[in-house]
Amino acid sequence: MKGRGLAMKVLTSLAVVAGAAALSACTGLGGSEYGYSSYGLVRVTRVRVGDGQMSVVAPRPYNRHRRILFSDVNDVEDWTLNGPILDGISFVSGMKNNRELIRQRRTADQQVPRFRSDMTPPEITAMLESLYRVKGGAVDLKTLSLQPRPFLGANGFQWDYEHLDQDELWRRGRAVGAVIDGKLYLILMDAARSHYYDAELPDFEAIVASAQRLG
């Protein structure tokens, strides 16, 4: 996916996209810097996300982002309700030490930091902010709060933030995550600040509450 995502604008418009120019138009975390994408239906039942180490239940049908060319970052998966320009939910399902949230060219001047298993919540949120700025095209990003929150039976965190992108649209997000046995588990919602964030927040909270660790 291209945009960001988890994990925020890194995908694209509703059907397919190619190239880094689409980065500022989407809300998602994983994926590569090139390739085409499509969507599949997520039904209201328990489903595994990412590489299968976490499962959740959506309160209503969602669209799961899939790649046609080039493989996804297996630990990261993205959903949308109204299209990635308006809203997105990203899942990181047990990312191991030294792994990336998004595939990157090694020759790129700016790099999103890799996850480290000893990262603190402030360091994880700094990694996510870097994803938004470097790959998502955010021109301004503000942390609204960072606080402890239980997640998957562990001591986790909740990060609330908002960002202005190159398309001049303010978006707001919330990430809930924890590092368990050295792996990052995280669910992130990012949506247009006007209407879409508040409308989708109850869905996000229901999905977070339903999350189960399988790996």
What are the functions of these language-model segments?
Residues 97-112:
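Acidic/histidine-rich, surface-exposed loop or edge segments in extracytoplasmic proteins
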